[in-house]
Amino acid sequence: MYIPAIGLVAGFEHESCRLVDGLIDPATLNLACAYTAPDRPYRLPGSNADDIVVIAGHAGAGTAAVFDPMYNADADHHNVQVGDVMYIRTETSGDHWLKYTASDLHSPEKGSLSQDVSVWGEGATPGRLLTISCIQPSFAPSVRNAVVGWQFAGVAGPGAELPPPVLPQGM
């Protein structure tokens, strides 16, 4: 996963995001995870995902975490802006990248996130992807989430409709 505008580069856990007390809680600080569940319509990232894709990652306070670049808790604002792009490469996509464009930004209370129609939509939402993290203020508990809505924009890479991303060295 790569978001050029904020320099975020992330790998993924091999398993679906775990749940702790009914809330998504990635198993590690340094990897993102995709959330799927038999009782939810969530899908894995793909060019033909027929419903919403959910990717989660931790933000840290006093320790580094994978989604730290997504939100500035001290200034209380998203670092991703509407129109920024994100690239995801999956086992299925091979050398190709799935390209998404940021469409909406949210910072709901954790307790209301699961029912927030402005985040989840109503009915199936093909091509929609959410990145979800905690807003982790310094020396305070996390009570809100940083959520970015993304819309699938196409496939990038060799022989695809879009050019591949220019990756940072070492990726």
Residue ranges and their predicted role:
Residues M1-M171:
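Solvent-exposed, non-transmembrane regions of membrane-associated and secreted proteins
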